């Protein structure tokens, strides 16, 4: 197993002051993302490009309009092919929102150790419509913008929970690969964020060299 300091240097990134926030991003970069985590929940909606998403030891190979559920404190990173533009929606959600039942999908993803929501064409169109309406409402300055934006966010999350909790998504074992040792290391880090997580400590605990290059899972 090849691990490096970059693997161990998991850090908290991003700050969220609102109940939720939506981003629509498109870029093309050679940046390599390190493992990191957030204090809030995150939904990633992959639109186009070539990308894999690593979450807690699983690497999901993404198809257009795949949705990923990233629980707060879950250690993760995207792996992007820089040869083509990478487009996605990112939805950040506070853990203390008034609608706690809408966070069930994140807990269930954690319980199942499975984070991918791959939709059939009908559900895909439904979710796309709500998502684009949500984006347009959030950017507008029309009357009732905040109420409509909140309503569309709630719609999106209700349908997302229905789809995931009721297993209406397409399950494909070939959509991900799994590395049990990396999963074990990440789980240890995730549950001991306030402890000594130095490269030396983790290397000794898991019998891996701190001098070797980053493994791609």
Task: For every predicted segment, state its role.
Residues 144, 148, 167-174:
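Hydrophobic/aromatic-rich alpha-helical bundle segments in the mid-to-C-terminal region
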Residues 1-67, 74, 82, 99-111:
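Generic protein-terminus/edge-of-domain signal
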Residues 157-170:
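Linker/hinge segments immediately adjacent to helix-turn-helix/homeobox DNA-binding domains
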Residues 47, 161, 190, 194:
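Short, locally clustered residues in the helix-turn-helix/winged-helix DNA-binding domain
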Residues 73-98:
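Ligand-binding loop in jelly-roll beta-barrel domains
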Residues 106-155, 159, 187:
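Amphipathic alpha-helical segments enriched in hydrophobic/aromatic residues interleaved with Lys/Arg
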Residues 177-185:
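N-terminal positioning helix adjacent to the helix-turn-helix/winged-helix DNA-binding module
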Residues 188-217:
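Basic/polar phosphate-binding segments, predominantly the helix-turn-helix DNA-binding elements
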């Amino acid at each position: 197993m090849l691990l490096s300091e970059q693997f161990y240097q998991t850090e908290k990134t991003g700050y969220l002051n609102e109940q939720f926030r939506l981003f629509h991003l498109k870029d093309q970069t050679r940046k390599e993302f390190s493992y990191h985590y957030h204090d809030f929940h995150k939904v990633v909606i992959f639109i186009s490009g070539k990308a894999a998403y690593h979450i807690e030891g699983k690497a999901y190979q993404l198809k257009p309009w795949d949705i990923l559920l990233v629980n707060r404190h879950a250690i993760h990173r995207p792996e992007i092919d820089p040869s083509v533009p990478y487009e996605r929606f990112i939805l950040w959600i506070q853990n203390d929102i008034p609608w706690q039942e809408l966070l069930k999908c994140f807990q269930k993803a954690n319980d199942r150790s499975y984070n991918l929501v791959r939709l059939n064409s009908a559900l895909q169109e439904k979710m796309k419509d709500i998502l684009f309406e949500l984006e347009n409402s959030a950017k507008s300055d029309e009357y009732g913008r905040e109420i409509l934006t909140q309503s569309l966010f709630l719609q999106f999350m209700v349908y997302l929970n229905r789809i995931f909790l009721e297993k209406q998504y397409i399950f494909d074992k070939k959509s991900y690969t799994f590395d049990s040792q990396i999963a074990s290391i990440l789980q240890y880090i995730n549950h001991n964020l306030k402890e000594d997580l130095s490269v030396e400590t983790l290397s000794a605990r898991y019998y891996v060299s701190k001098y070797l290059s980053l493994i791609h899972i």
